[in-house]
A protein has these predicted regions:
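Acidic, proline/glycine-enriched N-terminal capping motif
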Residues: 2-106, 111
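Acidic, low-complexity central loop/insert segments
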Residues: 114-175
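Glutamate identity and glutamate-enriched acidic tracts
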Residues: 1, 48, 54, 132, ...
Length: 175
């Protein structure tokens, strides 16, 4: 954590914007105090004055990103696997509990609607993340199935560790 006097004060978030669970800790690290709206949240545009080092880190090493503004859905029930296998491009039935799959989903003509992750939490228990709201679309595709779909976006903060050295870094800090 930086403590020099050149660190700007954290942004005052307008009342109309929410903050992520990580905002209080990371807001002072945003050097230019440049923010953007993301799904109703105040999100850092970049932490340094330019994107150069952040881009290089995610392409050649690792970067930790606050992705709390993503939409998150809990999908449970006897047909949860069947629903997800219907709507995403990955074979969700092959995922093990605790495994996360990156995937996309398409409309009836094969056009990509969105992408995100599916985490298998249990036998018929999943969490799906997406950049765009997908609740209505999920319900339409679940018609006639034994499945419960719950939006849990505001209940969970989320961090994404990405980059070619991310698995090694995670293993080093989690053992």
């Amino acid at each position: 954590q930086r403590t020099d006097r050149s660190t700007p004060p954290p942004m005052r978030v307008p009342h109309s914007l929410k903050t992520t669970p990580f905002h209080a800790r990371t807001a002072r690290l945003v050097q230019g105090q440049t923010w953007r709206r993301w799904s109703g949240y105040a999100a850092a545009s970049c932490y340094e004055f330019t994107h150069d080092r952040e881009y290089a880190a995610i392409r050649s090493a690792a970067a930790l990103i606050d992705v709390s503004p993503l939409f998150k859905y809990r999908i449970t029930g006897a047909d949860a696997t069947r629903l997800l296998d219907r709507v995403v491009t990955r074979d969700v039935s092959k995922a093990r509990p605790g495994q996360v799959l990156y995937t996309s989903w398409c409309d009836g003509h094969g056009k990509v609607i969105d992408d995100g992750t599916v985490c298998r939490l249990g036998e018929q228990d999943y969490r799906l993340t997406s950049a765009e709201p997908s609740l209505r679309w999920l319900h339409r595709n679940a018609f006639g199935m034994q499945v419960a779909i719950e939006e849990i976006s505001e209940a969970l903060g989320a961090l994404a560790l990405q980059g070619p050295t991310s698995a090694r870094l995670l293993a080093a800090v989690s053992d």
